[in-house]
């Protein structure tokens, strides 16, 4: 996706950058990094939204750090709220699905790192996935541009 359409990828690292710390030689850190591409068209304050996205990524990464949950493609994440995930809480986006980022898995000096992309989804889409009438993979196909769009 070109930079004219989205704010460049935001990435939250859960890998090892400077030295090997975990005992698994095949995996760098937790073995994945979270990415998110935010559609910039229609954003009132893009800089504020970028800071807010970084806070959301940090909160989501905390699930891994605190509970050991591994985010992989094909999952959904209900954020437990009915208000939007944008900075003003006005968006219909209340959760995320995961898919493999276009970059995929990379080899680092400290092991493999899979880039897992988060795509913002609406409450009704989360409900469809909870009720198993739609899968995250099916929704990712519908949202094939991979952008989190607060205006959809």
Give residue spans per PLM region.
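Short, small-residue-biased leader/transition segments that mark boundaries at the very start
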Residues: 2-7
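Residue-level marker of positions within ordered structural domains that often coincide
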Residues: 39, 65-66, 123
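A short secondary-structure junction signal
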Residues: 45-48, 72-73, 128-131
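Polybasic, proline/glycine-rich intrinsically disordered low-complexity segments
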Residues: 80-152
């Amino acid at each position: 996706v070109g930079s004219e359409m989205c704010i460049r990828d935001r990435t939250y690292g859960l890998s090892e950058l400077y030295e090997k710390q975990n005992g698994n030689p095949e995996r760098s850190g937790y073995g994945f990094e979270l990415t998110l591409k935010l559609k910039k068209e229609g954003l009132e304050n893009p800089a504020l939204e970028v800071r807010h996205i970084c806070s959301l990524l940090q909160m989501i990464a905390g699930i891994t750090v605190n509970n050991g949950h591994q985010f992989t493609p094909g999952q959904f994440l209900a954020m437990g709220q009915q208000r939007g995930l944008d900075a003003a809480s006005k968006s219909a986006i209340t959760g995320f699905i995961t898919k493999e980022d276009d970059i995929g898995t990379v080899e680092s000096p400290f092991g493999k790192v899979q880039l897992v992309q988060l795509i913002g989804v609406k409450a009704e889409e989360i409900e469809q996935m909870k009720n198993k009438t739609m899968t995250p993979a099916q929704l990712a196909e519908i949202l094939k541009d991979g952008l989190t769009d607060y205006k959809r």
